[in-house]
Design a protein with these regions (language model features):
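Thiamine diphosphate
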Residues: 183, 192-227
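Flexible, low-complexity linker and terminal segments
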Residues: 1-173, 178-182, 187-191
């Protein structure tokens, strides 16, 4: 989660293009899929090559004794804790710009991959034979923070202030939300319900107790058929 100032530009209306039927491109029956796979492979190869020149993939060289490859909000934490470090900020993480990453890795003495959750960038970088430090010290769990960097890289034991002793406030649907009425009826009927990701997932908790499954957006339909 993050926030920051936003500068709005003039609205640009998209070009109204007529629909053109193209089953060879859009209907992935086996014969078409085999042909289209060549286009996908070519596109990915060009993206990987051209990605090294994209402005959204930016190498910031400062102190080359330490370097970070990162993306998204973790970049802000790196800049906060290591303002003088060299940083490769990736705006496009798939496919990764191999040439740019290799050049960056050669110019820094110690390389860290600072990415939240799964080691997507890290595993690819290591597969290219580039030495780096990632999930050996950084967790796969939850959101990262500047304090995590201080603790794992600098060895600083950062003391955090305890939360004030406030009464617990469990998540609930907003007052007036129409989902409340829907779930109340479903609860009275004792119906099993398959849900999607969204605020209405709160229908699973008391006092509504309706939603039985939630996997991802759109999964409720196929899950319901399975139930």
């Amino acid at each position: 989660h993050s926030q920051g100032p936003v500068v709005l530009e003039d609205r640009v209306e998209p070009e109204d293009k007529p629909y053109e039927r193209n089953p060879g491109k859009n209907v992935m029956m086996p014969g078409n899929a085999i042909k289209r796979h060549l286009h996908v492979e070519d596109r990915m190869n060009r993206l990987e090559k051209d990605g090294s020149d994209f402005a959204i993939n930016k190498a910031e060289y400062n102190d080359t004794s330490i370097g970070f490859i990162t993306s998204g909000i973790p970049y802000q934490y790196v800049k906060e804790v290591f303002p003088q470090a060299s940083v490769l900020k990736l705006g496009m993480v798939y496919p990764l710009p191999k040439k740019l990453i290799e050049e960056f890795a050669k110019k820094v003495d110690k390389l860290y991959i600072f990415e939240e959750l799964e080691p997507v960038i890290e595993e690819q970088v290591k597969a290219w034979g580039i030495e780096c430090i990632g999930k050996e010290i950084f967790t796969r769990q939850g959101e990262y923070s500047a304090n995590l960097l201080r603790e794992k890289v600098l060895g600083q034991n950062v003391e955090t202030k305890p939360y004030p002793n406030l009464p617990a406030r469990p998540p609930i649907l907003c007052p007036g939300c129409p989902h409340r009425s829907t779930f109340t009826v479903l609860n009275k009927l004792k119906i099993h319900a398959a849900g999607d990701i969204g605020c209405y997932t709160l229908g699973a908790v008391a006092p509504l107790n309706v939603i039985d499954t939630t996997v991802c957006m759109g999964a409720s339909i196929s899950t319901l058929h399975g139930m």
